[in-house]
Amino acid sequence: MYQLLSVASVPLLASLVHGYADPGACSGVCTTHDPGLIRRESDGTYFLFSTGNKISYVSASSIEGPWTSVGSMLPDGSSIDLDGNDDLWAPDVSYVDGLYYVYYAVSTFGSQDSAIGLATSETMEYGSWTDHGSTGIASSSAKIYNAIDPNLIYADGTYYINFGSFWDDIYQVPMKSTPTAAASSSYNLAYDPSGTHAEEGSYMFQYGDYYYLFYSAGICCGYDTSMPASGEEYHIKVCRSTSPTGDFVDSDGTACTDGGGTMVLESHGEVYGPGGQGVYDDPNLGPVLYYHYMNTTIGYADSDAQFGWNTIDFSSGWPVV
């Protein structure tokens, strides 16, 4: 989640794009940004984590809601000694060996002084979280990447974290067998050589024989003060590979490290700037793409962002919503 100011001086809405389903129903507290979604193993309660308010989160009996506020995951902020440690970003939630892991980012807009932290809980109830501080995944102006927007995946017996935003875009690092810290150095998965290299928010999901690398492209934020030119707002793309560690290509065969990327979801109807996505394999619905978006009938401020979700059809070999 990296904010850029658009050069556009007049607000321009994205052209309507036909063919996308509207977001699924949502009731209760539906405002979110960079959502992270999981269902509790013990009772099936859904939890939705969000950027802001030291990782705010809500819970519900259904993905449709009604979502009710739980509070802040880390009400005292992060122990990571960086600017932004009281304004945490981009939560990614997983269930690992009986614990719920939430990776989060500490940074400030436009800065590479960033780090990825970890908090854990047995129940996800308010007040139950332990902050473990930095995972060792960090960046500074000396790096060619920005260590934000974490995403954990377990593949072929190894945990990996995918991360990155702008600069050289999306990276991956293998984690230790208990994924609290990086195990080795990182390497590039996706890069857009054009313009401002506007790719971030990666999320990897395995389906069938492929690993799908979803990511957000374009301008994420600040639409109420500087509307991007049509098509430059947030949208969701994907590449795929038979390996979790590289060789990702789009549906045309273009490498994801060379600007490749197949469109999954973009502005349409009352949906503007969808992004900050993840994928959850729901026991009732199957694979679900979840994300935040601006509902054009509500507003364009960052605080107006809504929780969106759609079921995914993989029958063509590529995700369709």
From Swiss-Prot:
It catalyses: Endohydrolysis of (1->5)-alpha-arabinofuranosidic linkages in (1->5)-arabinans. Induction: By L-araban, arabinogalactan and L-arabitol. Pfam families: Glyco_hydro_43 (PF04616). Its preferred substrate is linear 1,5-alpha-L-arabinan. The enzyme activity is progressively reduced as 1,5-alpha-chains become shorter or more highly substituted. The record marks D149 as: Important for catalytic activity, responsible for pKa modulation of the active site Glu and correct orientation of both the proton donor and substrate. Glycans are attached at N295. Pathway: Glycan metabolism; L-arabinan degradation. GO terms for molecular function: arabinan endo-1,5-alpha-L-arabinosidase activity. Coiled coil: none annotated. It is an enzyme of class 3 (hydrolase). It comes from the Eukaryota. One of its GO terms (biological process) is arabinan catabolic process. This is Arabinan endo-1,5-alpha-L-arabinosidase A. The gene is abnA. The keyword Hydrolase applies. The active site is at D34, E200. Keywords: Glycoprotein, Glycosidase, Hydrolase, Signal. It comes from Aspergillus niger. InterPro entries: GH43_arabinanases (IPR050727), Glyco_hydro_43 (IPR006710), Glyco_hydro_43_endo_a_Ara-ase (IPR016840), Glyco_hydro_beta-prop_sf (IPR023296). Residues 1-19 form the signal peptide. The lineage of its organism: Eukaryota, Fungi, Dikarya, Ascomycota, Pezizomycotina. Belongs to the glycosyl hydrolase 43 family. PANTHER family: ARABINAN ENDO-1,5-ALPHA-L-ARABINOSIDASE (PTHR43301), ARABINAN ENDO-1,5-ALPHA-L-ARABINOSIDASE A-RELATED (PTHR43301:SF3). Its EC number is 3.2.1.99.
